[in-house]
């Protein structure tokens, strides 16, 4: 996707599938390593998921940071409600593809649907764990 002046848009608009988006999350979760090979400099990865501006501590380089229910996370979000959410403490990557996005409020820079996706992922994991524990 190119602007009329011939300059590429490098800030958005990746068309992909959930599995490939999850790979981005895994690459950053693993500090730039993929299958044991360092693809991205770990210092660069750390900078990406560290607050960049004092006035906007929720944003790094292309990644948002937040904490939900005591879990620190970082995530990418797209114009149409796509999310790649990484929760390192639980080795968890959540991907949401979509065509609609939630709203941000004046008091919260994170869209309201982020909270829903994280909560639903943990609900699904709890149901899975409950099912696995009762089937033994």
Model-derived regions: residue spans:
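Structural helix-adjacent loops and short alpha-helical linkers that scaffold large soluble proteins
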Residues: 32-40
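Structured C-terminal helix/loop/strand segments within mature extracytoplasmic catalytic/sensor domains
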Residues: 78-136
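Non-transmembrane alpha-helical segments in soluble domains
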Residues: 22-29, 45-49, 64, 119
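Carbohydrate-binding/catalytic loop surfaces
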Residues: 2-15, 66-70, 79
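Stable alpha-helical elements in mature extracytoplasmic
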Residues: 17-21, 44, 110, 114
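Active-site Gly/Thr loop motif
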Residues: 45-97
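Active-site-proximal alpha-helical segments within enzyme catalytic domains
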Residues: 10-33, 82-98
């Amino acid at each position: 996707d190119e602007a009329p002046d011939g300059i590429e848009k490098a800030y958005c608009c990746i068309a992909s599938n959930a599995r490939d988006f999850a790979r981005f999350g895994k690459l950053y979760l693993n500090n730039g390593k993929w299958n044991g090979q360092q693809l991205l400099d770990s210092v660069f990865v750390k900078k990406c998921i560290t607050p960049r501006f004092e006035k906007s501590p929720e944003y790094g380089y292309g990644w948002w940071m937040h904490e939900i229910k005591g879990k620190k996370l970082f995530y990418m979000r797209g114009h149409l409600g796509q999310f790649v959410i990484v929760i390192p403490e639980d080795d968890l990557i959540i991907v949401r593809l979509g065509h609609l996005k939630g709203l941000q409020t004046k008091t919260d820079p994170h869209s309201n649907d982020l909270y829903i996706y994280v909560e639903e992922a943990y609900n699904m994991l709890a149901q899975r764990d409950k099912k696995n524990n009762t089937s033994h």
